[in-house]
Amino acid sequence: VQEQIRITDKKTPVGVFEEAVKTANDSIRQCASETPEFAGMGTTMVAATVLDDVAYVVNIGDSRLYRMSEDLRQITVDHSLVEEMVQSGEIRKDEMRTHPNKNIITRALGTDETVRPDCFEIQVRQGDVLLLCSDGLTNMLEDSEMEEILRENKNDLEQAGRTLVERANEAGGKDNISVILVRL
């Protein structure tokens, strides 16, 4: 993203995100084409930048952004088969985390020549906390568990991050776990 801010003529946050996603997608695809053991690799992503009272968000795949204000709210929508099943009414939202197809994503960086990220903006307030995380966290903990951990550690985000990872690992920790917490 920082590279794109320097070189792009698209100076809006959304324009910068779109260019950064395109560049990352091209780089991953090139690496996969040059190194046989990387063939077919891809990744998910979520990123945000805040200007004044607006958070600009981009996501691809099932990495998520949450906002903790009065309560914890999922902001991004997963690009996954189970999310599509929820939207069509085939399963309930509370069944996503344990569904056998929970790891099938419908969009990722590096898997297709072009990628369509979701780019949007949300209003934020001073004191809000943003949680950016991978599915290694959200597949192991319910949103209510994450909210409880954030409330218990509201004055120590570093400890909150450690506790989120520890609890996800204790719950089975089947995937890598990435957590970023930012207080506005």
Q: Whereabouts are the PLM-identified features?
A:
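PP2C/PPM-type serine/threonine phosphatase catalytic domain
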Residues: 1-184
